[in-house]
């Protein structure tokens, strides 16, 4: 095992269009085979489309609202105690909750039936900002699992 400890977190380069590290993370999640410009085109197209479809109905960008609706507060982790494995509910750290939310958003976008990835991502963002869609359902399922296993919370570490 290495003795140096964990590698330091590298600062995220903000994207040039929105100046947001969140958008940079989203681009990196969409990225396939190192094709960064293609990933940027998909993400920027989806964000512009989401803003256009959302219109002046709400202030702020739909991606922020979508992320708030997707980020999990609790999750379950397996803990082995005396031969039995318990699903122990634990709070999710902010960095992990963002990473999970982006992973779910992109994953459920890929599973959608629209023609282009830009449309899929845009519609998943719009659904998530309205509290619908697969990513929001995954968050609800995660919270339900944590609630159902609340009895094992004392095994937290």
From Swiss-Prot:
Family statement: Belongs to the universal ribosomal protein uS7 family.
Q: How does it assemble?
A: Part of the 30S ribosomal subunit. Contacts proteins S9 and S11.
Q: Which GO terms describe its biological process?
A: translation
Pfam families in the cross-refs: Ribosomal_S7
UniProt gene name: rpsG
Name one molecular function that GO assigns to this entry.
rRNA binding
SUPFAM superfamilies attached to this UniProt entry: Ribosomal protein S7 (SSF47973)
Does the keyword tRNA-binding belong to this entry? yes
Primary role: One of the primary rRNA binding proteins, it binds directly to 16S rRNA where it nucleates assembly of the head domain of the 30S subunit. Is located at the subunit interface close to the decoding center, probably blocks exit of the E-site tRNA.
Which protein is depicted? Small ribosomal subunit protein uS7
Which key words tag this protein in UniProt? Ribonucleoprotein, Ribosomal protein, RNA-binding, rRNA-binding, tRNA-binding
A single cellular component GO annotation:
small ribosomal subunit
